[in-house]
C-alpha cells in the first residue's frame, strides 16, 4: 500500500491506481450492502404480509367456528318446529281442561327462544322475498299492494339466519 511514501518503492501512479481499485471495490461492496438491505426490507415486508394474512385467516376460522357452533342445532330445531306449531294449534282449539298442554307449549317455546329461535313477522308487513314465500296473491281493499294479507305458515330465524321462510298470501292490486 501507499502508506509511507518514503519507504514505498512504487510510484505515485501505482498508488493512485491501487487507491482507485480500492475505491471501486468499496463502491461495489456498498452497492452489494444496499442490495442486501433492500432484500432484507423485501423479506421483512413479505413476512409482515404473511403474518397479517395468517392473522386474518385465524380470525376468519374462529368466526366460522363460532358460526358452526351457533347453528349446530339448526337441523334439530327445524324438525321440532312442526311439533311446536302442532302444539300451538292444539292450544288454540282446546277447552279449559288442557292447562297442562299450555304449560308444555310455553316451556317448549321458551327453550327454542333461548337457543336463538325467533319468529319472522309476516301479516301486515311488506312482502320481503328474503323472509317470505308468497304462494297466493289476492286483490284486497283493506291492504296496499305488496302487503302480506295472511300468514299461512310461520317463518323462523335461528341466530339472525333464516331457517324457514314464512308462507304467505300477498295483496296484489290489479
Curated annotation (Swiss-Prot):
This is Protein GrpE. GO terms for cellular component: cytoplasm. CDD domains: GrpE (cd00446). GO terms for biological process: protein folding. Its main location: cytoplasm. Belongs to the GrpE family. Pfam families: GrpE. Homodimer. The keyword Chaperone applies. It is found in: Cytoplasm. Keywords: Chaperone, Cytoplasm, Stress response. Coiled coil: none annotated. The keyword RNA-binding does not apply. It comes from Methanothermobacter thermautotrophicus (strain ATCC 29096 / DSM 1053 / JCM 10044 / NBRC 100330 / Delta H). One of its GO terms (molecular function) is protein homodimerization activity. Participates actively in the response to hyperosmotic and heat shock by preventing the aggregation of stress-denatured proteins, in association with DnaK and GrpE. It is the nucleotide exchange factor for DnaK and may function as a thermosensor. Unfolded proteins bind initially to DnaJ; upon interaction with the DnaJ-bound protein, DnaK hydrolyzes its bound ATP, resulting in the formation of a stable complex. GrpE releases ADP from DnaK; ATP binding to DnaK triggers the release of the substrate protein, thus completing the reaction cycle. HAMAP family: GrpE. The gene is grpE.
